[in-house]
Amino acid sequence: MADYLCKFAERRGLSHSRSANNCVVIRKAASPGYEDCEPLVILNHMDMVCVAEAGYDTPGSVTPIEYEENGERWMRANHTSLGADNGIGLTMALAILDDDSLKHPALEVLTTTCEEDDMSGAANLPEDFIKGRRVLNLDSEAYDEITVGSAGAHIQVARLPYRRIAMPAGYVAYEVEVNWGRGGHSGVDINSGRANAIKILANLLLVAIRQMNIKLYLVSFEGGQAYSAIPGEAAAKVVIPREDIEVFENLVMQCHEAVMGQYSQTDPKIEVTCEPSVWHSSVINEEGTHILLACINGIPTGPVEMRSDVEAQENNASCVLTSNNIGLVKQGKESFTVSSHTRSFSNDRLNGLARNIEQIFTLTGAEVETVMHVGAWQEDVGHPLIKLTMDVFDEVLHFRPRPVEMHFALEAGYFTERFPGIHIASIGPRIINPHSTTEHVSLTTADNIWQVVKTLLSKA
């Protein structure tokens, strides 16, 4: 994608720079009469969360569906994530660069990498990469809001070692799966009560060991597709004593019924299943099995603490003060990799919960790596950029967007640290269920935001 952006600039005779982390900034000179205006940075990211339902993970195998509802045009995902986050914003930015009829100050169209993972693109930008100190971010997902703050975030990845042993005699193999969880964005949707498939699966297997006294061994365990996504699917291969088959199958059935009841409103299609599997010559030793399941079970997921102020309680997107998500478990030859994504509007609480989770990991002998840490961001809502953005909404769309703080980290946290004096306004179309296979984007609001952006450029 970075290659494409550089070629895009070259074909149009626009200067550009590329960072070591493949972030790209494309510069466009001010329109006549705008030469003395302060430069404006237009910010987006080029990476997208790619998740797919089982059987639909081949690129290009499905086509998004367009439809109309109550007079509003929509595009929705079709068994895969849509990529409206941040494809819509990036499309607008490229359209601006491609249209010489627009009136605007000097522009720096900045497109970052790894925003959906560890934000390493923004975190490692050279301090002279951009000159502008006004940033219009087109990565918001709430049409009637302007984002002026974000939670801090800490992502850590633990590597839990294990040993393989020969499969015990008299054992049979099963594949246990949690499927059709709704998933979603672990910031936007963290207060929705949606199921975390990794957590459900680990809890089920730990109950089998500790409460049902089944001497269970793992063969494999994996789940999730991204740090920042609530995992809707997880799968494990296990072996159990032949005499425990009936008890184990009944336990899985009971778990399925309990999960269906608990998540009937949030994850109506979720299911927990087990099927006999092929024979395995080796399994993960007892210690490795127990450590992985206990770690996952002991780490909190979902909201940990709620905000107490009235304004936050009125806004579901920011009513959570502190949260955590286990978004990804992968298996290597000698270790499991488990990710933990902590968020908070309070830097003290962010650091405190992250330390507690790290201690859970390290007590098991795991190696822990911090892959992202960014503090909370709070914009000055009285800054001229914020006022201008709200005035343009009023002029073009006849309403003023509500300033909000979002419960997920934004690159703004890094920008305010790396570029002193910077101010950021974040807007965008209505996107529902980002990072999931039920992602929707309102094309009607995308058109409206495009009109806002063009008008804002002419007044910036």
Regions found by a protein language model. Give the residues of each.
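Active-site metal-coordination/substrate-binding segment of hydrolases
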Residues: 34-117, 122-133, 310, 318-320, ...
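Active-site-adjacent substrate-binding region
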Residues: 189, 196-221, 379-422
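His/Asp/Glu-rich mid-to-C-terminal helical/loop segments that flank catalytic regions of hydrolases
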Residues: 6, 194-211, 242-245, 291-302, ...
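Zn-dependent metallopeptidase/amidohydrolase metal-coordination segment
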Residues: 321-337, 341, 397-455
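Midchain, well-structured core segments that form catalytic/ion-binding scaffolds
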Residues: 72-76, 115-117, 123-343
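Substrate-recognition/cap regions that form aromatic- and gly/pro-loop-enriched pockets
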Residues: 321-408
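A non-catalytic alpha/beta surface segment that caps or lines the substrate-entry region
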Residues: 1-38
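Acidic, glycine-rich active-site loops and adjacent beta-strand->loop/helix elements
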Residues: 46-48, 110-118, 139-143, 182, ...
